[in-house]
């Protein structure tokens, strides 16, 4: 007689899956709609937007206006590295979106103080160039109709005569005298704009004169006004790294702004 085999049924492994559902009973954050809409229109970067939301969570989420929030807390809430959290937070403070009192930060509800797109400070490069280009093209384009007639009318059939009292050959245009640069004025303008945030420039040596002259020739407005605009643009675009927030204790200075690549970075928005 054959032995009967015992068959044990195999049951599938059942794992309990928890479905997480957001509920107001678990807590909520009250935010003014005007503030929310202003943030959405401000053109903030992803890192900056995450920091704003983290500040809301740690302040408005606990019915506070301001609180101390460490970089580690920001990192836990946003998933970013603490150093990136610090950089984005400092950028928002400089832009006036966040306020800082000591080590505490909070949201600046006075939207008119923000230096962002919502106030017109951040008009995009593409749009501004497009408007300028369109206007200049409409102004400067010649009338293209009746091209054949226009060409014939512009042909001068008269024999050109030499100017009275002068010679028609060998005359050369008078050379323009180069504008003398007051280098001390440029250093003073730089020191005034950077204030106490960057080291001041004192000495006007030959190397600085040479580099400054080259920089001025590269500016759109080749005078002290163009230089002041350049320094102001740098201060607005500079990151905490440029003000000493780095491992080397390095800070930007007057000679750093004389570098051609810094001017290019300011123009292209890649500083």
From Swiss-Prot:
Keywords, in A-Z order: DNA replication, Early protein
Region ranges (Disordered): 141-178
Pfam families: Phage_rep_O
KW Transmembrane (keyword) present: no
InterPro entries in the record: Phage_lambda_VrpO_N, WH-like_DNA-bd_sf
Superkingdom classification of source: Viruses
Extent of Polar residues compositional bias: 141-159
Keyword Glycoprotein applies: no
GO biological process: DNA replication
Family per similarity comment: Belongs to the phage O protein family.
NCBIfam families per the UniProt record, alphabetical: phage_O_Nterm
Protein name (record): DNA replication protein gp18
Organism in which the protein naturally occurs: Salmonella phage P22
């Amino acid at each position: 007689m054959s032995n009967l085999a015992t068959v044990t049924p195999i049951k599938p492994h059942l794992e309990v899956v928890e479905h997480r559902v957001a509920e107001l009973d678990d807590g909520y954050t009250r935010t003014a709609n005007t503030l929310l809409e202003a943030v959405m229109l401000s053109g903030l970067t992803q890192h900056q937007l995450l920091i704003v939301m983290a500040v809301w969570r740690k302040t408005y989420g606990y019915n506070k206006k301001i609180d101390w929030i460490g970089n580690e807390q920001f990192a836990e809430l946003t998933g970013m590295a603490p150093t990136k959290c610090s950089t984005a937070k400092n950028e928002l403070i400089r832009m006036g979106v966040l306020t800082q009192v000591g080590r505490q930060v909070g949201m600046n509800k006075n939207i008119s103080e923000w230096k962002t797109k919502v106030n017109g400070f951040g008009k995009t490069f593409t749009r501004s160039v497009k408007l300028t280009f369109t206007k200049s093209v409409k102004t400067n384009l010649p009338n293209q109709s009746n091209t054949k007639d226009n060409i014939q009318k512009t042909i001068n059939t008269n024999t050109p005569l030499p100017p009275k009292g002068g010679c028609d050959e060998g005359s050369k245009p008078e050379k323009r005298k180069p504008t003398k640069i007051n280098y001390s004025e440029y250093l003073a303008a730089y020191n005034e704009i950077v204030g106490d945030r960057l080291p001041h420039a004192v000495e006007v040596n030959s190397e600085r004169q040479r580099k400054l002259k080259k920089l001025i020739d590269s500016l759109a407005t080749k005078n002290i006004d163009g230089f002041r605009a350049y320094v102001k643009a740098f201060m607005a675009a500079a990151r905490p790294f440029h003000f000493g927030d780095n491992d080397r204790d390095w800070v930007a200075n007057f000679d750093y702004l004389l570098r051609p690549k810094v001017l290019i970075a300011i123009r292209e928005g890649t500083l």
